[in-house]
Amino acid sequence: FLDESGGACYCGKAGCVETVISGPALEKYYHKISGQPLNLKEITERYRDGNDKYAQQTMERLFAYFGKAISVVINIIDPDAIVIGGGVGNIAEIYTKGVEEVKKHVFNHRLDTQFFKPDLGDSAGVFGAAFL
């Protein structure tokens, strides 16, 4: 588990990826530290502007925990590719800064796993379920 301060997950546990680095979790974290509710797109824009310390803190937290979470997957199953879905997959920096954080935690000194945005955007899971 990543960080139990994210609160209870819908699965009944705490510290799950969903409660720490999903879009809603990032929005909740930003609101908690800043007192201001913003959506993920607004947080990302403020991060890029560089003038909002809470957006900076929120995004740096995302990259750090993303690196830890994804490195566990890579260290265990060594996938050729990972598709980053959901709102977080729309953040361009996840494919640069986030991947740099992954590199810090993988067993191998080089990272061969490729990272992709889903071709179907945020609806990839819905389309996949429909095909079942």
Show the residue positions of the predicted features.
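Short glycine-rich, Thr/Ser-proximal phosphate-binding strand/loop in the N-terminal lobe
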Residues: F1
